[in-house]
Amino acid sequence: MTKLLLVAAGGALGSVARYLVGVQALRLFGSNWPYGTFIVNLTGGLLMGLLAAWLALRGGAQQEHWRVLLGVGVMGGFTTFSAFSLETALMIEKRAYAQAFTYTTASVILSVAAIFAGLLIARRIFSV
C-alpha cells in the first residue's frame, strides 16, 4: 500500500509540473509547435538519467521507495517518454543495438498509428 501512495503522490506532482511547463511554454513560445511536450520529453529524459544514476550510486534500504516515488510517480506523471528513453539507453549500453532500434522505431510508429486508430474508433462511435 505504501508504494501505491508513493506512486499516486509522485504522479500528482509530476502531472502538475507537466501542466505548468506546458502553460509556460505556450506563454513564452506560442502555439505554432508543441514546445511544452518537447521540453517535457527532453527534461524528463535528463531527469530520468540523473535519477537512475543517483539510485544506482546511492543504494540503501530506501532506494526502492525513491525509485517508486520519483521514477514511477513523478517521472511517470511528468512524461512516460522518460521511461521509454531509459529503456532504450539501457539496451544501447548492453550493445543490443538492433533491439534498441526496433523498440524505438516500433514505439514511435505504432504509437502514432494507435492514435489514429483511437481517433477512427471514436469518430465511428461518437459520429464526430
UniProtKB/Swiss-Prot annotation:
It is a multi-pass membrane protein. Na(+) is not transported, but it plays an essential structural role and its presence is essential for fluoride channel function. Pfam families: CRCB (PF02537). It is found in: Cell inner membrane. GO terms for molecular function: fluoride channel activity; metal ion binding. The chain crosses the membrane at residues 4-24, 37-57, 72-92, 101-121. HAMAP family: FluC. Belongs to the fluoride channel Fluc/FEX (TC 1.A.43) family. This is Fluoride-specific ion channel FluC.
